[in-house]
Every structure is written in structure tokens, then in C-alpha cells.
Regions:
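A short, aliphatic-rich alpha-helical micro-motif
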Residues: 26, 162-163, 210-211
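Positively charged, low-complexity intrinsically disordered leader regions
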Residues: 3-48
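Conserved post-catalytic alpha-helical subdomain immediately downstream of the catalytic base
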Residues: 255-256, 280-343
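Conserved phosphate-binding/catalytic loop of the ribokinase/pfkB sugar-kinase fold
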Residues: 114-120, 127-162
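Conserved phosphate/ATP/ADP-binding segment of small-molecule kinases
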Residues: 176-274
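Substrate-binding N-lobe of the ribokinase-like
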Residues: 7-23, 52, 56-124, 339-344
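Short acidic, glycine-rich surface-loop motifs adjacent to enzyme active sites
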Residues: 164-177
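Structural motif
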Residues: 32-34, 137, 166-169, 198, ...
Length: 347
């Protein structure tokens, strides 16, 4: 039977108290972030009537906004917490790509490692909302694997950056950036250079794509689906999350699995044991981008000197910040410290 521990009580309080002084150690930590990127666009307005043309609401637009999305949000989370993010991704030759570059620069993330593919548009996700209610989402994207020539450029770009990096994050949104061959080549070369690889997996990607990575961070539903186990038959079992995690660890051939569990917190499954951590979310307005924040903060902390359980708690606190906000937003260093102080005062 797997040994289980919990980070709680006085041990948790002491760990949280240590975070402010340890944040400085992350300021020079460099992470390569690889993944599909795009713009999250919002059209906000009021609904007062139904269209006479069709039974749909008419949105009277009040404001519009664009934010960094997908792996670009991971990169800006790394930067906003004080690290350095080298973002490797593919964009189209269009105005959305130019907007992305501007927003990356303003978020202290260099756009210099983006690769242009004229055959595909830059991904955009347009959300039309009235108050907190989503009316519709419109996706502008092309889901297909890269050409051999563009994929080769992506791999070469990562290879060139590895010498100066401390670790690698692969953010998989299953839009075709990384084939199995490319992902495996990146993982193996990263290990050959002594760099840890952190993966946020996608439920539709075969588990073998991630073989050999050091840490994978699925949410509970993704973990169950990727494990191949039947959640309906297991949900009444108190140890089901351990069975899912261990099955996933073996199936993916990875060292460590971190399963984010919403209000139930987070569980780390290693070859030796399992560690449970509580949630730090006090109010949940929007979980969009929470997984991006978790892997960014966790990877930054771990390669910056935190043990893996400590890094998980660090990531959990950062996620508690962003779920209390609306939309895809990063956790800044100031936000983190303010939220941490409020947690300690309430403890």
C-alpha cells in the first residue's frame, strides 16, 4: 500500500511563512515554455432583447479586451512571478501575431523565439459575455501537425535555448505543435542536458507522447481519462486518486504525477509515496488558466530549489490567486505575496 502524507497544520504554516524570503531565489530562473499559443479575446456587453432574425440574444457591446492565452499565459505567469520565460511557439503571418508579440513584450516575455508558419493562422478564442454569463465562444484556429520543415525549426530552437535554461515546460493543447517524435526528441535532449521536463498534458493526446518526462500535471478529469480507468466505478473508493495517479505514472512512464483536484486541492504521486495538499482558493470566480498558473509556478519553484512537494504548495497558492479573478490572468509576485499574507492571517 502506498504511503500517504498531508502537508497541513504547523508544517504547512512554516512552509508558507518561508515563501516570501525564497521568492528572490527564483528571479534568475530560466524556463523554456513550449506549446500552442493564442489570444483570448473578450466582447463584453448587455443583453436586453432577443433578435427578431433568430431566437438568439442580442449583445449590446460595452467593451472589448484581449489577453495572452494557452502557453503564452504559462510564459507570462513565469515572468510575473519573477522568472525568465523563453517562449517557443508557432504563429501565423497575421495581425493577431503582431498583437501577441506586443502583449508578450508588455508582459516581460520575449517574442523573439516565435516561429512563423504562413500555412496556419494565429489561434484566437473569442468569447462573447454578458456579465458572468458566456453567450458564445468562437475559435479561429487550425488543428493540424506542423510541416516537417517547421517542426524541425521548433526542435532546433529548443535545442539552442537549452544550454542557458534551467528547465522545460511543455504545455499541450493538442493543436498540432508537437508530434510524438518532436516531443520525445525534446524530452530526451533536455535530459541529456540535465534539465527537468514538466508537462501539462491534454486528454486527447496518447500517454506515450509524454514518456520520460519528470512531472505531469493533469487535472482530475484528464488524469482519469488518460489512465484508462473507469471513474464511475471508482469514485466511491477513498483511494481512487492514488490508483489513477499510479496507473498514469506507469502508463506514461513518468517519474511524478501531480493531479489538481479543484476544491479538494492537489495530490502528488511519486515512486515512493503520495502527498496531499489543501486548496488555497477562498473564492472561485473563473478557473480559466488555473492549470497554466499551477505548472508555471510549480516548475519555477522546483527548478529554483524548492522540493517537489514544496513547489506543489507554491503552485497551489498561485492558483488560489487567479481563480479569484475573471478571465485568463497571471499571478504576479505582488498578488502572490498579498494573498499569502491574507492566508497566514486567517490561519
Amino acid at each position: 500500500m502506498m504511503k500517504e502524507t498531508r502537508i497541513e497544520g504547523q508544517a504547512l504554516r512554516q512552509l508558507l511563512q518561508s515563501f516570501p524570503s525564497r521568492l528572490d531565489s527564483l528571479s534568475k530562473t530560466k524556463l523554456i515554455v513550449i506549446g500552442d499559443i493564442g489570444l483570448d479575446e473578450y466582447v463584453l456587453g448587455d443583453v436586453r432583447r432577443i433578435s427578431p432574425e433568430a431566437p438568439v440574444p442580442v449583445v449590446e457591446v460595452q467593451s472589448q479586451d484581449s489577453r495572452l492565452g494557452l502557453a503564452a499565459n504559462v510564459a507570462q505567469n513565469v515572468a510575473s512571478l519573477g522568472g525568465i520565460a523563453h517562449l517557443v511557439a508557432v504563429v501565423g503571418e497575421d495581425t493577431a501575431a503582431e498583437d501577441l508579440r506586443r502583449r508578450l513584450k508588455s508582459s516581460s516575455v520575449s517574442p523573439d523565439h516565435l516561429i512563423v508558419d504562413k500555412a496556419r493562422p494565429t489561434t484566437r478564442k473569442l468569447r462573447v459575455m454578458s456579465g458572468p454569463h458566456h453567450i458564445v465562444r468562437v475559435d479561429f484556429e487550425r488543428k493540424q501537425y506542423l510541416s516537417a520543415e517547421v517542426e524541425k525549426r521548433v526542435i532546433q530552437k529548443v535545442s539552442d535555448l537549452l544550454a542557458s535554461a534551467d528547465g522545460v515546460i511543455i504545455e499541450d493543447y493538442a493543436k498540432g505543435l508537437l508530434s510524438e517524435t518532436a516531443m520525445q526528441q525534446i524530452i530526451k535532449e533536455s535530459h541529456a542536458r540535465g534539465k527537468k521536463v514538466f508537462v501539462d498534458p491534454h486528454r486527447s493526446t496518447p500517454a506515450k507522447f509524454y514518456a520520460g518526462s519528470d512531472v505531469v500535471t493533469p487535472n482530475r478529469d484528464e488524469a482519469v481519462e488518460l489512465s484508462g480507468l473507469d471513474y464511475d466505478d471508482m469514485r466511491m473508493s477513498p483511494g481512487f486518486i492514488l490508483e489513477v495517479g499510479e496507473r498514469l505514472r506507469q502508463k506514461m512512464k513518468v517519474e511524478n504525477v501531480v493531479i489538481t483536484r479543484g476544491q479538494e486541492g492537489m495530490t502528488l504521486i511519486t515512486p515512493e509515496d503520495a502527498t496531499h495538499m489543501t486548496t488555497f482558493a477562498r473564492q472561485v470566480f473563473d478557473v480559466t488558466g488555473a492549470g497554466d498558473t499551477v505548472i508555471a509556478a510549480l516548475a519555477l519553484a522546483h527548478v529554483g530549489g524548492f522540493t517537489l512537494p514544496e513547489a506543489c504548495v507554491f503552485g497551489n497558492v498561485a492558483a488560489g490567486v487567479v481563480v479569484g479573478k475573471v478571465g485568463c490572468v497571471p499571478c504576479t509576485r505582488a498578488d502572490f505575496l498579498e494573498y499569502l499574507q491574507s492566508l497566514l492571517e486567517q490561519a
